């Protein structure tokens, strides 16, 4: 919100949603009230499949993942990153480059998530890094969790892309 407030060309309507309640968030504002949706992770992918409005994804950059892994650095237990491929691909890249001893578990959908985290618990993982839904599911199973957050730059990049898209649609590219 702070980044959008600095941009006079952006009128921002915010709704908080995740893989469990994305439909409620989408339906809470008339589609005629906005030109583009900005979201991240699996929620962005779900919205892109079902919303009639273009969806811009806040990507999880290597920097975002590095910050999240660094925040977990002092943790002594077995660590796993769980999420959709747009999150886990970055984690896998970093694990290989930095030689981090972490488990990376991609999921396809919400149904996969609970089973994946349950299996990770059985494998001895006790810290799960992921999105909001992963974090909540891990806590339901008695595991520690940390949210993978998006950097200011990742959000700024998504805002820039949204403005470019709307201008192109309006013929002002």
Where are these regions (language model features)?
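Non-catalytic structural scaffold of enzyme domains
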Residues: 1-173
């Amino acid at each position: 919100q702070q980044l959008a407030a600095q941009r006079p060309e952006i009128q921002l309507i915010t709704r908080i949603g995740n893989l469990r309640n994305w439909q409620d968030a989408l339906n809470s504002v008339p589609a005629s009230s906005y030109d583009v949706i900005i979201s991240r992770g699996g929620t962005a992918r779900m919205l892109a499949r079902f919303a009639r409005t273009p969806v811009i994804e806040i990507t999880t950059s290597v920097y975002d993942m590095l910050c999240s892994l660094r925040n977990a650095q002092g943790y002594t237990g077995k660590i796993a990153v769980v999420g959709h491929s747009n999150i886990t691909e970055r984690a896998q890249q970093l694990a290989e480059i930095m030689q981090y001893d972490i488990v990376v578990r991609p999921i396809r959908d919400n149904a996969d998530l609970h089973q994946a985290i349950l299996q990770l618990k059985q494998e001895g993982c006790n810290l799960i890094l992921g999105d909001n839904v992963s974090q909540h599911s891990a806590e339901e199973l008695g595991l520690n969790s940390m949210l993978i957050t998006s950097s200011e730059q990742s959000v700024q990049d998504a805002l820039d892309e949204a403005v470019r898209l709307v201008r192109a649609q309006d013929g002002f590219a």
